[in-house]
């Protein structure tokens, strides 16, 4: 079972949300996504009437990002916050000419991508791999990973860089695409991420970001404890349990647009797709709760699923009320 020495750790990680806290949270909770989707995409997905599972929705979101990014004309793609690198493998399988650099601060997840790359080179569609968890979750897990790639033989070499999003170790004007697929909400300070991205992106390059956002929520941005506590209290009344279980910063769209503009980006397109993200995902979980609950209980204490379920209900409610949304943002340099 996925136990902690201190059960309060996830709450502390979520409240502080420092870089190492985010790593610890993902190492501890990424299994929930794996159990729910039977895969390692680590995104909410993009749903429509033809999609029946979270995995299909996650592939759909990756396809949407490929279209918005115009990846078919790209050369070098920097995938910032690449997680387990599964979206990058998918894009590479679609477009063999892409040079994709997977960058993440989470070394454990990068190692998973390296291991997966080795298995895909052998053209095995289903394999078992072992990934060692962090010291905060002293357990290794093994699971089946099914990679249904369009052209498996194309999913060959990806590059991996263990670095932070606010200090990108690349030369100026060195890539023509930057993608942050459901990762930028964790980057602090986010304005530094935008400035670094603008620096390494070449002239006329395309920057695409997909992330959860909130509507009409004032945020205090001073880096002191008092301001952080005031902000947390104000958010609690709107977000409820999501204040703690939504393990990221809570940005509104105007704030994001302002910081991107200050960094030198020209906004080209904004898609608000919240109704195609939160509500169908919530519906899927509610309809399949008993099965998912049993699977989760094998790896996590009972309270984890209870918190997850309450968070799912709250997420659905706030999406219907348009308090939360999901933005796909395209910009150029």
Place the predicted regions along the sequence by residue.
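N-terminal auxiliary segments of SAM/dcSAM-dependent transferases
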Residues: 1-35
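Substrate-binding/catalytic lobe of Class I Rossmann-like enzymes that use SAM or dcSAM, i.e.
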Residues: 222, 234-323
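Class I SAM-dependent transferase core
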Residues: 23-68
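A short acidic, Gly/Pro-enriched loop at the edge of an enzyme's catalytic core
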Residues: 166-178
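Class I SAM-dependent methyltransferase SAM/SAH-binding core
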Residues: 78, 87-167
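A short glycine-rich, Lys/Arg-flanked "PGG" loop and its adjoining helix->strand segment in the class I
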Residues: 191-206
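Conserved class I S-adenosyl-L-methionine
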Residues: 74-83, 208-236
